[in-house]
Amino acid sequence: MNPRKKVDLKLIIVGAIGVGKTSLLHQYVHKTFYEEYQTTLGASILSKIIILGDTTLKLQIWDTGGQERFRSMVSTFYKGSDGCILAFDVTDLESFEALDIWRGDVLAKIVPMEQSYPMVLLGNKIDLADRKVPQEVAQGWCREKDIPYFEVSAKNDINVVQAFEMLASRALSRYQSILENHLTESIKLSPDQSRSRCC
């Protein structure tokens, strides 16, 4: 029996203030709904270990603050991340309209830029009646950017696990691809090195 590979991945969750990022994270990691609203200042980190195929993943998930005045500070936490959950509140049109800014902030901090970077969009609070962002509009935004979309409820635990694990799977694929490319590049011999020489 082969031992499982172990991989550590850093994921981030970003979006406007009040969209439920902390509640989504607590629902995923602890299976509890985080009702008491407190603004996240900077970032907080939770970890979860999951198994995908033959790999044990340790997910370190950074919950970033959504306040405008902290955006430049928060964006420093994006560096070195392997994937991102973009979140908005389906009852708050402004949180949806701000997604391009959040996505742009994340992509501006990711190195190397030429690599694909896994993202998933979550439309949270589908349990509430006063919806302002139609599902079709969010799906259209995602189609343009080739990002998977999930309608979720942190309160009722709808699609939360599926969304996080879709991102984890894509982040793992990217990690493995980068690792393979790096190994391939380091193994290649230059023409001069490949010729055998004699004294």
UniProtKB/Swiss-Prot annotation:
A lipid is attached at residues 198-199 (S-geranylgeranyl cysteine). GO terms for biological process: cellular response to type II interferon; endosome to lysosome transport; late endosome to Golgi transport; negative regulation of toll-like receptor 4 signaling pathway; negative regulation of toll-like receptor 9 signaling pathway; phagosome-lysosome fusion; positive regulation of interleukin-6 production; positive regulation of megakaryocyte differentiation. InterPro entries: P-loop_NTPase, Small_GTP-bd, Small_GTPase. PROSITE patterns: RAB. GTP binds at residues 15-22, 34-40, 63-67, 124-127, 154-155. It is a lipid-anchor. It is found in: Late endosome; Lysosome; Golgi apparatus; Golgi apparatus, trans-Golgi network. Pfam families: Ras (PF00071). CDD domains: Rab. PANTHER family: RAB FAMILY (PTHR47981), RAS-RELATED PROTEIN RAB-7B (PTHR47981:SF22). This is Ras-related protein Rab-7b. It comes from Homo sapiens.
